[in-house]
């Protein structure tokens, strides 16, 4: 029992301010508008930040227009978007905090092992927000909900990724 209490405190400490149900609903409803645009989302990230594309050995040094129509690109884009979809589906319910924490912690460890920096995570965030703001119903409330969601996510991921 003490283990679960400690785990809960660690999670709450890492995600000190979980999304409210209203924020989670805003994130979910906006995400539902684009979650099937996997290739477009990843292409937007790579176009805005070629240094991120360079971190993917299968895409490094290749012309974005030529790779974004490949099956390999679609498969990888789907992996990324599916991960985000899973996190978003779990958001807004405090009972899911430990699951979210575990997924994001693993994301941080995996990306640290690949040499991904906090700066590149922040570039991804900027590109994702830019894509979302031009492809979904967007207002200050949606922007604030996404900022809160990504801040929570990055707080956990950055526990293992050096500054």
From Swiss-Prot:
Query: What does the record give under GO molecular function?
Result: heme binding; metal ion binding; oxygen binding; oxygen carrier activity
User: What does the entry list as the binding residues for heme b?
Assistant: 76, 111
The protein's matches in PROSITE patterns, at most eight in alphabetical order, are given as:
GLOBIN
InterPro entries in alphabetical order = Erythrocruorin, Globin, Globin-like_sf, Globin/Proto, Mb-like_M
Signal peptide limits: 1-16
Give the family per the record. Answer: Belongs to the globin family.
Q: Which Pfam families match?
A: Globin (PF00042)
Can you name this protein? Answer: Globin CTT-V
Checking CDD domains in the record gives: Mb-like (cd01040)
Keywords, comma-separated and alphabetical? Heme, Iron, Metal-binding, Oxygen transport, Signal, Transport
Note the superkingdom of the native organism.
Eukaryota
Q: State a GO cellular component annotated for this protein.
A: hemoglobin complex
